[in-house]
A protein has these predicted regions:
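Rhodanese-like catalytic fold shared by cysteine-dependent sulfurtransferases
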Residues: 2-34, 39, 45, 53-86, ...
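Phosphate-rich cofactor/ligand-interacting catalytic cores and adjacent structured alpha/beta frameworks
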Residues: 49
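Metallo-beta-lactamase
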Residues: 89-91
Length: 128
């Protein structure tokens, strides 16, 4: 009985550890709202909004540029002019911007995700 328990526990531990290693998501650089707010006036950074045009037109971080997540990769040539800058990518909650950050990194940009997106943003907002 003890042998069965030891074997069962060992198998469970191996399966558990394997699933943790296998499902470990790729990490991306992330900024908090507070950190992002400090960078807003830094000319070495640009903020890119990957929400829909309607969301961006309603409210957005001042001086941010808009490229919807759906069009981001196909418009990468338009973003090339920002290659020398660090890019802060944001959306409503941080999900779309996480995808956008990965796309930009894939193309060689220095990009980071604004954690929590507009839901967590405490800085200034332009309302149109």
């Amino acid at each position: 009985m003890k042998l069965f328990f030891i074997i069962g526990t060992t198998v469970f531990a191996i399966i558990f550890l394997w699933s943790c290693v296998k499902s470990n998501p790729e990490t991306i650089p992330t900024l908090s709202s507070h950190q992002g707010e400090k960078l807003l006036s830094n000319h070495n950074y640009i903020f890119i909004d990957v929400r829909t045009k309607q969301e961006h037109d309603t409210s957005h971080i001042p001086n941010s540029t808009h490229f919807s997540i759906e069009s981001l990769e196909s418009r990468i040539d338009e973003i090339e002019k920002y290659k020398e800058k660090k890019i802060v990518v944001y959306c409503r909650s941080g999900n779309r911007s996480s995808k956008g950050t990965k796309i930009l990194i894939k193309y060689g940009f220095e990009a980071m995700n604004l954690s929590g997106g507009m839901l967590q943003w405490k800085g200034p907002v332009d309302n149109n």
